[in-house]
């Protein structure tokens, strides 16, 4: 019984962590993160570092595959962050 209780507790903690990362817009994410994903499942993700996948910044702040790059980096034509 204790094992079942422990498993349930761990599962609930994991679900709370997943839910806390969901977002509806950029305003839901902390600094250094953007709201990215499909229409049904968006999560706060970190801005892209050097060589990581990215999407160019846009005025609507809507991203599906990944976030824009960190400051001082730019998103190349092959959607990878590189030095500006």
Swiss-Prot record:
Keyword DNA-binding among record annotations: no
InterPro entries recorded: Prokineticin_domain
UniProt entry keywords in alphabetical sequence: Disulfide bond, Secreted, Signal, Toxin
GO cellular component, one term: extracellular region
One MF term in the entry's GO annotations: toxin activity
Cystines in this chain: 23-35, 29-44, 34-67, 54-75, 69-81
Stretch forming the signal peptide: 1-21
Tissue-by-tissue expression: Expressed by the venom gland.
Location of this chain's protein in the cell: Secreted
The keyword Zinc-finger is annotated on this UniProt entry: no
Superkingdom of the source species: Eukaryota
Annotated family: Belongs to the AVIT (prokineticin) family.
Protein name: U8-theraphotoxin-Hhn1e
Organism: Cyriopagopus hainanus
């Amino acid at each position: 019984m204790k094992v079942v209780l422990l498993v349930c507790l761990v599962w609930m903690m994991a679900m709370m962590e997943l839910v806390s990362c969901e977002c509806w817009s950029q305003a839901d994410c902390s600094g250094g993160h953007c709201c990215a994903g499909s229409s049904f499942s968006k999560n706060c993700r970190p801005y892209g570092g050097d060589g990581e996948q990215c999407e160019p910044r846009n005025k609507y702040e809507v991203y599906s595959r990944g976030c824009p790059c960190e400051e001082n980096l730019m998103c190349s034509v092959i959607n990878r962050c590189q030095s500006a």
